[in-house]
Amino acid sequence: MRVTMSLEALTTEALAAIAAAQDLVALDQVRVQFTGKKSQLAEQSKALGKMDPEERKVQGAAIHAVRETINNALTERQTALQQAALAQKLASETIDITLPGRGQCVGTVHPVTQVQERICQFFTKAGFTVATGPEVEDDYHNFEALNIPGHHPARAMHDTFYFDANHLLRTHTSGVQIRTMETSQPPIRIVCPGRVYRCDSDQTHSPMFHQIEGLYVAENTSFAELKGLLINLLNEFFEKDLKVRFRPSYFPFTEPSAEVDIMDERGRWLEVLGCGMVHPNVLRAAGIDPDKYKGFAFGLGVERFAMLRYGINDLRMFYQNDVRFLRQFA
């Protein structure tokens, strides 16, 4: 009878301690105190071994009942404390849905990329394929194979970024044309977009800029065909019928060569690109017989086209990461 009363008192004390626990840490301390390995309940369980069988049966059942009562109370209190903690957290993190929301920032394609894709799309519709090549180029593909002699100004250190005597950052995408001619048989019809590099930086020049060059090699190409293609490009890109003129010029890799101008709204001629018939030496260097095949080539600056199309007077604005400027092209 003495042990049974002790269990009743233990149960009462444990339930009171459980109810008084104000957080999960305190509740765990109560659990250890009343059901742990060193608790009074554990000591009474050890004492069962010294009792006779009949008494052990009665007291064992009583101890089990007390343990179950305490564990149930612990579980209920734990659930209540967890719910209270969650409610408190939700209350402290409540969002005022009456406040104005923040607009979603929407990204867009960079204007230079937009212009490059627009130009490439024109040429792919005309039957050209897009070809790419390395930006770190060797001297042969960047200069030698393009009929650019060793004394040419473009080879000077102040115009070209050199890694060593034979490797450099390409100054144009013409090297892609040479590599394509070396590995393909005519007819060849490609455009070569990409980044190019020159030692130049001012309002209309950048050390890094984008070019698109084109090449068409076949048995019966002509300057008239080149002229018609480029006039169609300019009219479609600027979405108007432009006055276009072809001025005689000089490029080492084309002969004859021309620069192409368009007339603006004020009646001024603006240079937009260069072109010409591929020089026989260039065809020969790529392993193509110039007596059998002819070709024409052209090259334009993507930023130049973008500036003319959108009325931008400083090329550097494209690369200043000013969202106010770039947002206009979204």
UniProtKB/Swiss-Prot annotation:
Upper taxonomic lineage: Bacteria, Pseudomonadati, Pseudomonadota, Gammaproteobacteria, Moraxellales
The protein's name: Phenylalanine--tRNA ligase alpha subunit
Organism in which the protein naturally occurs: Acinetobacter baumannii (strain AYE)
Broad class of the protein's primary localization: cytoplasm
UniProt record, GO biological process: phenylalanyl-tRNA aminoacylation
Textual note on the cofactor: Binds 2 magnesium ions per tetramer.
UniProt subunit comment: Tetramer of two alpha and two beta subunits.
Subcellular location as annotated: Cytoplasm
UniProt xrefs under SUPFAM superfamilies: Class II aaRS and biotin synthetases (SSF55681), tRNA-binding arm (SSF46589)
A single cellular component GO annotation: cytoplasm
Gene: pheS
PANTHER family named in the record: PHENYLALANINE--TRNA LIGASE, MITOCHONDRIAL, PHENYLALANYL-TRNA SYNTHETASE
Alphabetic keyword roster: Aminoacyl-tRNA synthetase, ATP-binding, Cytoplasm, Ligase, Magnesium, Metal-binding, Nucleotide-binding, Protein biosynthesis
